[in-house]
């Protein structure tokens, strides 16, 4: 668990990410990356036709099946699937923020500015605002290293 002195950094980073995230969720913009649209095509094929065509070689079936479940849930609940995809992406970003901060706490690091450099780097932000598997993969990779 994060100590109190580190907790504020998690909340600051997460709150700033949330404010950056708001326009994307309002516009239901799944991202500038073409891989996001390929992933969406895979999800729709899998859900509607029960046909798995990888979004890109070699395919990322775990994340594609996860999004297919969310797509089905959105149809069942009559919700917009882009919104649910983006919310799930944001949850992975928050999880990554939490685990990265735990690495700094585990090392008793006083260089917390490095945490902010990591979580506000352009590639971290861009991939966090696109419906793509980068943050999901990062989450499970960091979790494996942390545990």
Predicted regions and their residues:
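Short acidic/glycine- and proline-prone juxtamembrane loop motifs at membrane-interface regions
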Residues: 34, 56-57, 126-136
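Membrane-interface starts of transmembrane alpha-helices
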Residues: 5, 76-88, 110-114
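Hydrophobic core segments of transmembrane alpha-helices in multi-pass, intramembrane catalytic enzymes
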Residues: 39, 63, 93-97, 118, ...
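Short hydrophobic/aromatic helix or loop-helix immediately within or flanking a transmembrane segment
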Residues: 42, 53-78, 87-90
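Transmembrane-helix motifs of polytopic, lipid-linked glycan transferases
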Residues: 83-109, 140-147
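Membrane-proximal lumenal/periplasmic loop motifs of glycosylation machinery
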Residues: 24-32, 47-68, 82
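Transmembrane signal-anchor helices characteristic of membrane glycosylation enzymes that use polyprenol
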Residues: 5-36, 46-48
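Short helix- or helix-capping micro-motifs
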Residues: 17, 114-122
């Amino acid at each position: 668990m994060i100590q109190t002195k580190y907790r504020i950094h998690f909340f600051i980073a997460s709150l700033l990410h949330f404010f950056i995230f708001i326009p994307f969720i309002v516009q239901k913009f799944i991202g500038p990356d073409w891989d996001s649209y390929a992933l969406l095509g895979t999800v729709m094929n899998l859900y509607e036709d029960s046909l798995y065509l990888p979004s890109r070689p070699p395919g990322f079936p775990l994340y594609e099946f996860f999004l297919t479940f969310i797509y089905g849930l959105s149809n069942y609940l009559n919700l917009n699937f882009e919104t649910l995809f983006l919310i799930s992406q944001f949850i992975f970003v928050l999880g990554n923020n939490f685990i990265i901060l735990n690495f700094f706490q585990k090392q008793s690091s006083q260089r917390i500015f490095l945490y902010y450099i990591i979580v506000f780097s352009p590639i971290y932000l861009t991939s966090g605002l696109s419906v793509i598997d980068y943050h999901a993969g990062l989450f499970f990779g960091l979790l494996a290293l942390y545990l």
